Amino acid sequence: MTRKQKRLAIIGGGVAFLTAAVLLVMFAFSQAVAYFYVPGDLAKADVAPGTRIRLGGLVEAGSVKRGEGRTITFTVTDTLATVPVTYTGILPDLFREGQGVVAEGAFVGGSPVFVADTVLAKHDETYMPKDVADRLKAQGVTLGGEENIR
């Protein structure tokens, strides 16, 4: 090989390596991202079964039911729509009806029930994450304690 051919081979190998690295990083990020939805958005969104998402809203009053073992079912609402949720595990201490919650998981097998593997409750009675508050406000839900939105 001439010097020119060697140089082209090295440059071509470097470009191929960088392309492969960028594709691997993009694939890893796409697998780690969980988009945020409120129940009213899910009706418009095309979320494929098995796709990980974060579902945020309020725990509907009277919807919390304890099943066998550590399985809990409850309903998340934004006052415009509701989504039934199933969670197996220990709920946060601040989890209760009427409080804000963010559940992370997926819809499994085309079922309308959201299967959560992580449930987060807001840390006091007035705090609400800004993205949850913005989504609820966009759908016309009035919020008390707006000075506590962070």
UniProtKB/Swiss-Prot annotation:
<feature type="topological domain" description="Cytoplasmic">
    <location>
        <begin position="1"/>
        <end position="7"/>
    </location>
</feature>
<keyword id="KW-0735">Signal-anchor</keyword>
<keyword id="KW-0408">Iron</keyword>
<feature type="binding site" description="axial binding residue">
    <location>
        <position position="127"/>
    </location>
    <ligand>
        <name>heme</name>
    </ligand>
</feature>
<dbReference type="GO" id="GO:0017004">
    <property type="term" value="P:cytochrome complex assembly"/>
</dbReference>
<keyword id="KW-1003">Cell membrane</keyword>
<feature type="transmembrane region" description="Helical; Signal-anchor for type II membrane protein">
    <location>
        <begin position="8"/>
        <end position="28"/>
    </location>
</feature>
<dbReference type="GO" id="GO:0046872">
    <property type="term" value="F:metal ion binding"/>
</dbReference>
<feature type="topological domain" description="Periplasmic">
    <location>
        <begin position="29"/>
        <end position="150"/>
    </location>
</feature>
<dbReference type="InterPro" id="IPR036127">
    <property type="entry name" value="CcmE-like_sf"/>
</dbReference>
<dbReference type="InterPro" id="IPR004329">
    <property type="entry name" value="CcmE"/>
</dbReference>
<protein>
    <recommendedName>
        <fullName>Cytochrome c-type biogenesis protein CcmE</fullName>
    </recommendedName>
</protein>
<keyword id="KW-0812">Transmembrane</keyword>
<comment type="function">
    <text>Heme chaperone required for the biogenesis of c-type cytochromes. Transiently binds heme delivered by CcmC and transfers the heme to apo-cytochromes in a process facilitated by CcmF and CcmH.</text>
</comment>
<dbReference type="GO" id="GO:0020037">
    <property type="term" value="F:heme binding"/>
</dbReference>
<dbReference type="GO" id="GO:0005886">
    <property type="term" value="C:plasma membrane"/>
</dbReference>
<dbReference type="InterPro" id="IPR012340">
    <property type="entry name" value="NA-bd_OB-fold"/>
</dbReference>
<feature type="binding site" description="covalent">
    <location>
        <position position="123"/>
    </location>
    <ligand>
        <name>heme</name>
    </ligand>
</feature>
<keyword id="KW-0349">Heme</keyword>
<keyword id="KW-0472">Membrane</keyword>
<keyword id="KW-1133">Transmembrane helix</keyword>
<keyword id="KW-0201">Cytochrome c-type biogenesis</keyword>
<keyword id="KW-0997">Cell inner membrane</keyword>
<keyword id="KW-0479">Metal-binding</keyword>
<comment type="similarity">
    <text>Belongs to the CcmE/CycJ family.</text>
</comment>
<dbReference type="Pfam" id="PF03100">
    <property type="entry name" value="CcmE"/>
</dbReference>
